[in-house]
């Protein structure tokens, strides 16, 4: 532990093309082996595909997709008296964003299209329309929280 007090979170710089911090986080999560240029190319190509297929502003589609994927509730295991309970909790805003990005990328990587840019574009368009694996993951998480509402009084 540091002796000089709390070290704050590092703030990411907004991406150069759309001036969005959330998009930078998506690009950073998409990146493998430090190849940020490649991750940016994939992301911007995906945005071009969205622009061509929907005719809408890609940033609007991305924001809509994020809103549809970010979870409000999640369950966390809590051990009480030898039994483990799944306790529903509200998700902090930062974690909501992180989970949304993570689920979109996982769902995109599992898709069948040939190129990652097409997969990402497809998943973002599906998520914007409340379809796709990422939205399904959010619904599952909410269902789990709803099913375990009886244990809400065990909150942290």
Curated annotation (Swiss-Prot):
GO molecular function, a single term: rRNA binding
GO process annotations (BP): translation
Presence of keyword Transferase: no
Domain of life the protein comes from: Bacteria
PROSITE patterns, alphabetized: RIBOSOMAL_S7
Coiled coil region boundaries: none
Keyword Iron among UniProt keywords: no
Alphabetically ordered keywords of this record: Ribonucleoprotein, Ribosomal protein, RNA-binding, rRNA-binding, tRNA-binding
Gene Ontology terms: cellular component: small ribosomal subunit
Function: One of the primary rRNA binding proteins, it binds directly to 16S rRNA where it nucleates assembly of the head domain of the 30S subunit. Is located at the subunit interface close to the decoding center, probably blocks exit of the E-site tRNA.
Family: Belongs to the universal ribosomal protein uS7 family.
Assembly and binders: Part of the 30S ribosomal subunit. Contacts proteins S9 and S11.
Protein name: Small ribosomal subunit protein uS7
Organism: Clostridium tetani (strain Massachusetts / E88)
Lineage of the species this protein comes from: Bacteria, Bacillati, Bacillota, Clostridia, Eubacteriales
Gene expressing this chain: rpsG
């Amino acid at each position: 532990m540091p002796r000089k007090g709390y070290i704050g979170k590092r703030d990411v710089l907004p991406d150069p093309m759309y001036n969005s911090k959330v998009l930078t986080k998506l690009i950073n999560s998409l990146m493998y082996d430090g190849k940020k240029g490649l991750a940016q190319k994939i992301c911007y190509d995906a945005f071009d595909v969205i622009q061509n297929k929907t005719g809408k502003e890609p940033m609007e589609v991305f924001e809509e997709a994020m809103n549809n994927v970010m979870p409000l509730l999640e369950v966390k295991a809590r051990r009480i008296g030898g039994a483990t309970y799944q306790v529903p909790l509200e998700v902090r805003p930062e974690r909501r964003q992180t989970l949304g990005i993570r689920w979109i990328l996982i769902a995109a990587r599992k898709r069948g299209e040939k190129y990652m840019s097409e997969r990402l574009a497809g998943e973002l368009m599906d998520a914007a329309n409340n379809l796709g694996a990422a939205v399904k993951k959010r619904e599952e998480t909410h269902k789990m929280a709803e099913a375990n509402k009886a244990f809400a009084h065990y909150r942290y």
